Amino acid sequence: MKHILATLFPKQITNTYPGQKIALFVFVPLTLMLTFRSCMHLIAPDGGAQSIATIPLDTYSAGAAANVIAIFSQWGLSQLLLTLLFILVLVRYRSLIPLFYLIFAVEMFGRMAVGHFKPVVTLETAPGASSNMPLLIAALIMLGLSLMPSKSGDASD
């Protein structure tokens, strides 16, 4: 338990990654996916609400649709800020990769829990809804692997 906490919350933050290399390699496509997702919410005219998540905006009043789009775009900005931290960790502070897998897993679990109690009405299953559980499972596996010391030495610079 002491090793886990020390790995999650290192006394010194460095660019030395302590875990299994597969978790480091998987962190790259995860970060790319997060970047794409956040940019789509910011750039898409509907914030991805109808075009991706299949929320029936065309059945809403103009004001209600505009509010949903604004919330999606603001959510995209929040996601982009978190994504920039993921990029910073990947490039400069790799010792924090285990912590960021934990943050991602907690965020995924929280999103699923909130969605269970406050579901979003969509015409079809939104990509986010269908990918949440696989991403949570993958994040937990990568978290476990990132907490296991690397046998071949540390991955850095």
Predicted regions and their residues:
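Non-cytosolic membrane-interface motifs at loop->transmembrane helix junctions
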Residues: 53-55, 121-134
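Core segments of alpha-helical transmembrane spans in multipass integral membrane proteins
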Residues: 32, 52-87
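Juxtamembrane helix-break-helix junctions at the cytosolic face
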Residues: 83-98
